[in-house]
Amino acid sequence: MNIEAQSVAPPSFDQWRRSKPALTRLECDLLLGLVTNMSRTQIVINSDRTLDLTQLKRLEALERAFNKGTPLAYLLGEKEFFGLAFDVSPAVLVPRPETELLVELSIEKIDAGQSILDAGTGSGAVAVAIAHTRPKVEVT
């Protein structure tokens, strides 16, 4: 007797998201966006769209890495900090959200024409955020 394996159709975006209770909706949407090259808005609007097998395999690999402790920012290759997108990898410290307070406090205290030296602070996100927000301040 020849028994053929019954194939299961890949899930829709929404079905995949609902099957991942350990991930937040944001985490799911960001991973879906990565494998589909779609914005989060497009993911939400097209929630009934079906994943193809390549996308599903890539999502499964990303989920395994995430569950083993790889930061989401490393999987995505970027992290937003103070409204700016920074490329990140395991070779770069991921800018932390609470560090945005340091930028806010610095911006309040720095006057135009002053110079700031950023030395050995990790990714440089603090310096870039200050320079972006206060263009008349010299940041090195």
What is each stretch, according to the model?
Residues M1-S19, G69-F81, I130-A131, T140:
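Generic hydrophobic segment detector
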Residues M1-V44, D48-L51:
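Non-catalytic accessory regions of SAM-dependent methyltransferases
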Residues T24-L31, N67-A73, A119-G120:
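Short, functional N-terminal and low-complexity linear motifs
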Residues R25-D29, E80, V139:
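Short N-terminal secondary-structure initiator segments
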Residues G33-E108:
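Conserved AdoMet
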Residues E98-T140:
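Conserved SAM/SAH cofactor-binding pocket of Class I
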